[in-house]
Amino acid sequence: MQTSKFHFLNFLVIALVTFLLAGFQTTFWFQLFGEFPAPLVWLNIILYLMLYRRPTEAILEIYFLGFLISAAYSAQPIGIIWLVFFILFSIVYSVKTRFFWPGPRYFFFASLATTALFHVVFILISQLLEPNPSGLLFLTRMAEIIFTGLISIPTFLVLEKWDRISADELANESATQPNTAEVE
């Protein structure tokens, strides 16, 4: 019982931080930096859950965070957000099972790739499903990819520290997964 209480507390804090960072990105960032593109810090948190949680837990937590972000800070339909997250999860999990090494360097490159993939998948789904699809906005999206990558290492270190503080070994799949990047 104690373990599931810590696991719930761990996710509750992560959800609260995601909510606050998404709020910062959508409101306060523009007060400080004008129209300069904001990093998608919430996407780094979702990536962390994709990489460091068991698949079932990860997808449920990601869907909850997608609902939270979409309902509070986005005009995008929840179905599109969930479809994008499902496609991202499928690709990230597939790559993770082929090669994965825990640490900030892997997370940095995964963040760059996931953010780029997020934009590509989002644009494609928007073009296919929406009557008024999202624009390409190439320079804005490139800036978001770069800034999200740059903020990924501090995000990773904070989330890893939180997992250690909350002693959430059950949630942390990397603790039980062997390093598949090594050649035998």
Regions found by a protein language model. Give the residues of each.
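Terminal, non-globular segments
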Residues: 1-184
